[in-house]
Amino acid sequence: MYGDVANKLVLEAKRTDHLANGSATLQLPMFQDEMVRVILKEVSQLQRNAEYLKLQEDSGKLSKCQYFVTMLCMERNKRCLLAYQKTRSEILDAIAWENNGLDTMDLLSNKGHDSGNLSPYEQEYLREYSQLISDLTAGELMDIDLAGSLTPPSDVFIDVRVLKDAGEIQTEYGVFNLIKDSQFFVRQADVERLIQQGYLQKL
């Protein structure tokens, strides 16, 4: 029946979103190439049906209703495809920003992720988007932390605990020697990146 595969694809998009939001590291499951192909084939079949119904001489209520339902099915399939692609592209964007635009395909392989989970178009998108980020961060905006949080901190100074040894860190307010299990009261802006990298834990 029309729309069944599109519903499965929407469920896959929800699963992908829950998987990305529920884990510490961003992950993408295998791209559902077969489902996407079936939906595209279904859309082209619906398009042919709609064109046939539009050309019918008899424009009674029945043919108008058939045409309307066919167009609704086609639009729903397209929306489901776009929702699936948008979910995956948002996760790819987050992966690229998390790695500051470094060669993300190599990093994915090193972290145990299979880049084969991405379609060829997604691989190209991720590579080019990562290149844009690295160009931005290496140019005139080098001094600005573009990967930082967009929400302002609620507290200027925070308590942090050191999770991993990191050596001496120079900040605006002095030098901190980050030794495992030690605690500091520091300015949040100075240690935001270390928290993201897993060296510090906000208390």
Swiss-Prot record:
Q: What is its main location?
A: nucleus
Subcellular localization is given as: Nucleus
**By its UniProt entry, which CDD domains does this protein fall under?**
GINS_A_psf1, GINS_B_Psf1
Q: Which GO terms describe its biological process?
A: DNA strand elongation involved in mitotic DNA replication; double-strand break repair via break-induced replication; mitotic DNA replication initiation
UniProt entry keywords in alphabetical sequence = DNA replication, Nucleus
Gene Ontology terms: cellular component: CMG complex; GINS complex; nuclear replication fork
Function description: The GINS complex plays an essential role in the initiation of DNA replication.
Q: Quaternary structure per UniProt?
A: Component of the GINS complex which is a heterotetramer of SLD5, PSF1, PSF2 and PSF3.
Protein family according to the UniProt entry? Belongs to the GINS1/PSF1 family.
Q: What is this protein called?
A: DNA replication complex GINS protein PSF1
Q: Which gene encodes it?
A: PSF1
